[in-house]
Amino acid sequence: MQVNDLGFIATILFVLVPTVFLLILYIQTRKETEG
């Protein structure tokens, strides 16, 4: 099975972007709750 480079990059971005976004939100809320 040949891997389509564009599809592979799109899949990585599709997974990575929401994960990074959630991590940033999580860290920001933790800093606020810690004071």
Swiss-Prot record:
Q: Name one Pfam family in it.
A: PsbM
TM segment ranges: 7-27
Write down the membrane topology.
Single-pass membrane protein
User: Can the keyword Membrane be found in this entry's annotation?
Assistant: yes
Kindly list any coiled-coil regions of this protein.
none
Matching HAMAP family: PSII_PsbM
List, alphabetically, the NCBIfam families matched.
Answer: PS_II_psbM
UniProt subunit comment: PSII is composed of 1 copy each of membrane proteins PsbA, PsbB, PsbC, PsbD, PsbE, PsbF, PsbH, PsbI, PsbJ, PsbK, PsbL, PsbM, PsbT, PsbX, PsbY, PsbZ, Psb30/Ycf12, peripheral proteins PsbO, CyanoQ (PsbQ), PsbU, PsbV and a large number of cofactors. It forms dimeric complexes.
| Stated role | One of the components of the core complex of photosystem II (PSII). PSII is a light-driven water:plastoquinone oxidoreductase that uses light energy to abstract electrons from H(2)O, generating O(2) and a proton gradient subsequently used for ATP formation. It consists of a core antenna complex that captures photons, and an electron transfer chain that converts photonic excitation into a charge separation. This subunit is found at the monomer-monomer interface.
Q: Which family does it belong to?
A: Belongs to the PsbM family.
Kindly provide the name given to this protein in its UniProt entry: Photosystem II reaction center protein M
The gene for this chain is psbM
